[in-house]
Swiss-Prot record:
Species for this entry: Arabidopsis thaliana
CDD domains with a match to the protein in the record: F-box_SF
Protein's UniProt name: Putative F-box protein At5g38270
Domain F-box: 20-67
Pfam families to which the protein is assigned, alphabetical: Beta-prop_KIB1-4 (PF03478), F-box (PF00646)
Length: 406
């Protein structure tokens, strides 16, 4: 049956035929084409040329997160819109790989040999990082792999001790960040293990860096808690609520000392009666400002789950609670940077001023919903939970991935 959509397609086809140049399509026509594409093709389209990329940035399309899930230790990928479940092995990921972080269309993964690699979900391109068994710069630590199949992957070995590395310690006691420039291919990876070790790698380095001895963390009784990366700087949140900053813009990473306003002014928050802070994370806005985000369980008249966001007033050097993060920015809890978002809700509650999260932000005993991810509106403190499906329940370990954005 002939429909108005058929007429529109014919009109578009005619204009394209007359134009003969896909890069010079009328912006309105190009935008309508881009917004009609599947999630995967939508993000591939921005790489066609600079004109397409410029138009792509103006599109209003729902930010539907893909879900990376582990079902009985098998890696699965769910693409919204297509309503399909893919096995990790079908897209190029092995079952013994574990998600660590994401950036753009890329995932940072680690396997059971503690082998790190970054993987583009749209192109299946894979970049292997140097082996952790090779020489590590900056600290007296090395990794010894367990070559027998078993629970333990190996050990980090120092002169006075050995620390076990296993699936549990990697998935539960590690934090990681990935940044990649999709056009130049430059990238930076950093990760925390066991709150004790911080490693980093920048494209072009001949080995990993270890920062433990550089800062003498253990003698100062300090631990690494979280990290974020933006604008060539790595921000590290440590115990006692201090924040260190490392500049990666040069050949070698250098700690920023004089121009780091956060070190001498640690974050402080006194909980109110009935408040329980479960997790603390940092994130960097596009302006470069640092945010500290708390996931809070408030036990007052009835239990309520909340998020609090704090930002330093750079004039007074006082951390202040904020109710907004900008007109076109939103957060994925634990991701480390804000991402571009539509001002109005275009689906699932995801819009500017919202926080997308998975349910492990709350204590293990507290299960506020049957599903495993939701969206928190900062303005109203209301949570919109995702729709329940066969894989969307609190017993499935889930990570959220926004291709092209985070």
């Amino acid at each position: 049956m002939y429909t108005p959509n058929d007429s529109m397609r014919e009109e578009i086809s005619l204009k394209v035929f007359v134009n003969h140049d896909w890069s010079k399509l009328c912006p309105d026509i190009l935008r309508s084409i881009l917004e009609s594409l599947s999630s995967t093709d939508f993000h591939r389209a921005k790489t066609v040329c600079s004109d397409w990329y410029s138009n792509w940035k103006t599109c209003v399309k729902p930010l539907c997160p893909w879900r990376i899930m582990y079902v009985k230790d098998s890696l699965m990928l769910f693409k919204p819109g297509e309503d399909k479940i893919y096995k990790g092995t079908n897209v190029g990921l092995s079952n013994d790989s574990y998600y660590m972080a994401s950036s753009g269309n890329w995932l940072l993964m680690v396997d059971s040999h503690l082998g790190f690699y970054i993987f583009n979900l749209l192109t299946s391109k894979r970049i292997d990082l140097p082996s952790m068994e090779s020489s590590i710069r900056g600290g007296k630590v090395r990794f010894e792999q367990n070559h027998e199949h078993g629970f333990n992957w190996g050990h980090f070995v120092e002169p006075s001790r050995k620390v076990t590395v296993s699936k549990i310690t990697i998935t539960r006691e590690s934090r990681a960040v990935l940044w990649i420039d999709e056009r130049t291919g430059d990238f930076v990876v950093a990760w925390i293990f066991n709150y004790r070790y911080l490693f980093s790698y920048k494209k072009g380095d001949d080995s990993w860096w270890n920062w433990n001895n550089h800062w003498n963390m253990e003698s100062l009784n300090l631990s690494f808690l979280d990290l974020a990366y933006r604008n060539s700087k790595l921000y590290i949140y440590i115990t006692k609520s201090h924040i260190k900053v490392v500049d990666f813009s040069g050949n070698d990473p250098i700690e920023v000392i004089d121009k780091n306003p956060y070190w001498e002014h640690p974050f402080r928050y006194l909980t109110k009666k009935g408040e329980y802070i479960n997790k603390r994370r940092i994130a960097i806005q596009k302006s470069g400002d640092v945010l500290i985000i708390l996931s809070v369980l408030a036990q007052r008249s009835k239990e309520k789950v909340l998020f609090y966001i704090f930002k330093m007033n750079l004039a007074s050097k006082i951390w202040e609670r904020v109710e907004s993060i900008g007109d076109d920015e939103m957060l994925i809890f634990g991701h480390g940077v804000t991402i571009r978002a539509p001002v109005q809700d275009v689906g699932d509650g995801i819009k500017s001023g919202s926080i997308c999260f998975v349910s492990d932000v709350w204590p293990p005993y507290y299960s506020p919903a049957a599903t495993n991810w939701g969206v928190f509106d900062l303005a109203t403190s209301i949570i919109k939970w995702s729709k329940k499906d066969s894989f969307n329940n609190r017993y499935v370990q889930t990570y959220l991935f926004f291709p092209g954005f985070a």
